[in-house]
């Protein structure tokens, strides 16, 4: 996986994909900065009146349901439909799905009407979206939904059904991250517990995923693995530097973006802890 990850991240820097993010106002700044740090070019337009034009100029689309309202819903559907028409890969982050009827119905309508190259969320959100189960507390995954070494293969098998049904790649985040498509899955063991102590780490990871997919659209699963693991490595680097400085969560957030902007793809790949497996019968 290390060689594929280096190629994926190098492609991202070479292409500098214009990544159109319709995201939430809590984390838009961090998402834009982490995209710049990884080598992408962000545009954060969310006015329904212009999103079809903006997405037509873009290389990839990321839609994030964090702060939903009627305007952002209209913008999301308009941009995503146009992206599908133009063959521009779209990525969905179903933030907080399961917490409210409006949020859940919006996410399920998107699944019914839009083709997404990848879908990323915490385990609770993915479970609520895929199977109508899962416990949601704000935008944090419930402890009962945690993926562990003991159940990761069983969880991956369930996610495989979802990925196959919607012809997508699914990233379910947690202490262990799972990256699943219809044929294979990867367990990503990179990451820092400090990420759960700031708002926006998941949104940033999804933004990076969208950019990686945009720059590697023929290898979506590999792009998803590389993006997830590389962002996790940046979290580990940021945690170490924060502790060394005696810093807190604001320091960690800054160090996270610093790590993304200074670490070369080869260095990130050296630190990957990824296990890839093919599903039986494939």
Segments and roles (model prediction):
Residues 199, 208-254:
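Conserved post-catalytic alpha-helical subdomain immediately downstream of the catalytic base
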Residues 1-44:
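Glycine-rich phosphate/adenosyl-contacting loop at the front of the ribokinase-like
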Residues 103-185:
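Conserved phosphate/ATP/ADP-binding segment of small-molecule kinases
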Residues 72-121:
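Glycine/small-residue-rich loop that forms an oxyanion/phosphate-binding "nest" at active or ligand-binding sites
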Residues 188-200:
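Short pre-catalytic strand/loop immediately N-terminal to key active-site residues, enriched for Gly-Thr
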Residues 233-282:
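Charged C-terminal helix
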Residues 34-87, 92:
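Active-site cofactor/substrate anionic-group-binding motifs, chiefly glycine-
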């Amino acid at each position: 996986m290390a060689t594929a990850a280096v190629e994926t991240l190098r492609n991202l820097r070479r292409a500098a994909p214009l990544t159109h993010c319709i995201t939430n106002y809590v984390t838009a700044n961090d998402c834009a900065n982490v995209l710049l740090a990884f080598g992408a070019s962000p545009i954060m337009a969310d006015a329904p009146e212009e999103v079809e034009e903006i997405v037509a100029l873009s290389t990839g689309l990321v839609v994030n349901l964090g702060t939903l309202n009627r305007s952002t819903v209209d913008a999301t559907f308009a941009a995503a439909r146009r992206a599908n028409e133009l063959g521009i890969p779209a990525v969905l982050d179903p933030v907080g799905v399961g917490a409210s009827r409006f949020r859940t119905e919006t996410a399920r309508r998107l699944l019914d009407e839009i083709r997404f190259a990848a879908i990323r969320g915490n385990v609770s959100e993915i479970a609520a979206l895929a199977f109508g189960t899962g416990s949601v507390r704000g935008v944090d995954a419930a402890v009962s939904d945690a993926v562990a070494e003991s159940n990761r293969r069983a969880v991956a098998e369930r996610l495989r059904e979802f990925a196959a049904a919607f012809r997508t790649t699914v990233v379910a985040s947690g202490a262990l991250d799972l990256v699943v498509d219809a044929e294979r899955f990867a367990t990503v063991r990179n990451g820092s517990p400090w990420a759960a102590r700031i708002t926006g780490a998941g949104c940033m990871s999804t933004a990076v995923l969208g950019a990686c997919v945009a720059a590697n659209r023929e290898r979506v699963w590999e792009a998803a693995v590389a993006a997830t693991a590389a962002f996790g490595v940046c979290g580990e680097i940021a945690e170490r530097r924060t502790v060394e400085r005696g810093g807190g969560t604001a320091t960690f957030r800054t160090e996270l973006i610093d790590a993304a902007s200074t670490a070369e793809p080869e260095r990130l790949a050296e630190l990957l802890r990824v296990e890839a497996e093919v599903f039986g019968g494939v």
